[in-house]
A protein has these predicted regions:
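Extended, low-polarity transmembrane helix blocks
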Residues: 1-28, 49-50, 54-55, 73-187
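Cytosolic, membrane-interface loops and tails of multi-pass inner-membrane proteins
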Residues: 30-46
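Short secondary-structure junction/hinge motifs that connect adjacent elements
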Residues: 35, 54-58
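A general structural signal for well-ordered alpha-helical packing
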Residues: 37, 62-66, 79-82
Length: 187
């Protein structure tokens, strides 16, 4: 089992790290913090919160490196799980479960991995085990804690968004904006 958890931690952790590095540094084909902030603004997050949120999302995902090494594993898992909650709520939920439709299937799997590794512990091939921290920072209640805090943290982050118009109001607002642009061009 120790080898299985090691493999899971390393693969998922390095993928999370890469995704965070895209946001923080623009590495691996990413766009960096300013473009990520712009994307968050398009998702409805207030302008003054967008850049700090982009940096926090990048740091939380960069925690994948800690997860891969099994160092401060429960804390790293909390950051990773929280980012997945926000990703589902802002981007994927409206598309349904399946990722073929842009849904949250993959995000749910990553969230579950973070919680499961926290509940089961990072395994004997981890820095936490080397330091003797496994029994103090993992277990069922730690997993439950990551589950609850990631959901609560995600809910708090969602409160930083601007109120969203219902879809029909959004369509009407876009139509009015297009009419104004057309009138301006014609004038």
């Amino acid at each position: 089992m120790a080898y299985g958890i090691l493999f899971l931690r390393v693969v998922v952790g390095l993928l999370f790290f890469g995704h965070g590095a895209q946001k923080l540094f623009g590495w691996f084909g990413g766009h960096g913090p300013r473009a990520t902030a712009g994307f968050l603004g398009q998702l409805g997050f207030r302008r003054e919160h967008a850049l700090p949120m982009a940096l926090m999302a990048g740091l939380s995902e960069a925690a994948g490196l800690l997860f891969a090494f099994g160092f401060l594993t429960s804390l790293a898992a909390l950051g990773m799980a929280s980012v997945m909650v926000v990703a589902v709520a802002t981007v994927h939920w409206r598309n349904g479960l399946w990722s073929t439709d842009g849904g949250y299937e993959f995000n749910l799997v990553l969230w579950a991995v973070a919680i499961a590794v926290t509940a089961s512990g990072p395994g004997r091939f981890s820095l936490d085990a080397l330091l003797g921290w496994v029994d103090n920072a993992s277990g069922v209640w730690w997993g439950v804690g990551v589950l609850v805090v990631s959901l609560a943290g995600g809910a708090l982050v969602m409160r930083l968004r601007e109120p969203q118009l219902p879809a029909e109001d959004t369509d009407a607002a876009l139509t009015r904006e297009q009419e104004r642009e057309t009138q301006t061009i014609v004038s």
